[in-house]
Amino acid sequence: MDQNEANIYNENNENNENNENENCQNEPIRIKIII
């Protein structure tokens, strides 16, 4: 893995973590709507 690949890999991991955090915050709202 060269430096560019490493940077892209790290950016993707950060984006995935951010998406997981946003999904957790949205989860209760989605559940309320379903109920």
From Swiss-Prot:
Q: Where is this region: Disordered?
A: 1-35
User: Compositionally biased, Low complexity: which spans?
Assistant: 1-27
Say which domain of life the source belongs to: Eukaryota
Q: What is this protein called?
A: Putative uncharacterized protein DDB_G0294382
Q: Which organism is it from?
A: Dictyostelium discoideum
- The organism's taxonomic lineage, starting at the top: Eukaryota, Amoebozoa, Evosea, Eumycetozoa, Dictyostelia
